[in-house]
UniProtKB/Swiss-Prot annotation:
It catalyses: (S)-2,3,4,5-tetrahydrodipicolinate + NAD(+) + H2O = (2S,4S)-4-hydroxy-2,3,4,5-tetrahydrodipicolinate + NADH + H(+); (S)-2,3,4,5-tetrahydrodipicolinate + NADP(+) + H2O = (2S,4S)-4-hydroxy-2,3,4,5-tetrahydrodipicolinate + NADPH + H(+). Its EC number is 1.17.1.8. NAD(+) binds at G9, A10, S11, G12, R13, M14, G91, T92, T93, S115, P116, N117, M118. Its main location: cytoplasm. This is 4-hydroxy-tetrahydrodipicolinate reductase. One of its GO terms (molecular function) is oxidoreductase activity, acting on CH or CH2 groups, NAD or NADP as acceptor. GO terms for biological process: diaminopimelate biosynthetic process; lysine biosynthetic process via diaminopimelate. Pathway: Amino-acid biosynthesis; L-lysine biosynthesis via DAP pathway; (S)-tetrahydrodipicolinate from L-aspartate: step 4/4. The active site is at H148, K152. It comes from the Bacteria. Catalyzes the conversion of 4-hydroxy-tetrahydrodipicolinate (HTPA) to tetrahydrodipicolinate. Keywords: Amino-acid biosynthesis, Cytoplasm, Diaminopimelate biosynthesis, Lysine biosynthesis, NAD, NADP, Oxidoreductase. (S)-2,3,4,5-tetrahydrodipicolinate binds at H149, G158, T159. It comes from Lawsonia intracellularis (strain PHE/MN1-00).
Amino acid sequence: MDLSIIVIGASGRMGKTIIQVAQEQGIIIDAVIDRPTRLTSLASYNIASDSEPDKIFSRYPQAVVIDFTTPETSISMAQVAQKYGNPIIIGTTGFTLEQFDTLETLAKTSRIFWSPNMSIGINVLLKTLPQMAQILGNEYNIEIVEVHHNKKKDAPSGTAMRIAETLSTSRHWDLEKVACYNREGIVGERPQEQIGIQTIRGGDVVGVHTIYFIGPGERIEITHQADSRKNFAQGALKAAEWIIKQKAGRLYTMMDII
């Protein structure tokens, strides 16, 4: 089956990058969706465009929807995609627990793929970090620092939270109890069962995540640096190629691919 896609938020940074990479790879772009005020800026693509997903999804029910927008928009798009049978790839972060529950419920009857970071490198890291945490043991304190551009709306990043969740699970900790997002004043000694998660925002940084394992007399630093949004787009398109061969039933992630 030939891959064809529908890009949501096509005038945004990720939307433009997805279109560019898809064109470079010869992938068919059936349509784009954006706000009414932004549709004129998309005319140069010579692709079907609209602000109403029902009109587009019903016209291209086999196309894979790719969405890197906002939690509210992503939920709405997933609901419309379910209606017409479109698979959907979601790279949005910042979901509330209730919103994420909605996604998981929708995934029982429609094909939904979600990842807070579509980078292959980050997901390989997520797969290997638990082993490091277990081997090093609790004597090695875990700290996470993430850096992103000044336009990013959510903090900490979805990727930082996914890293923290992965590491806390590997040590059988409850992340809600051990996460530390801020230290100020006289906070006392650092508890052994704690994961620090710090956020930096500035400039046009695409994304940097550093994980520290700090032990007696030594420190291990692991850094993933995204130099271009193209790697996120490539990951999303890889997911799109994969999901058209899958069945509904659960929420898929990059862990299912790598």
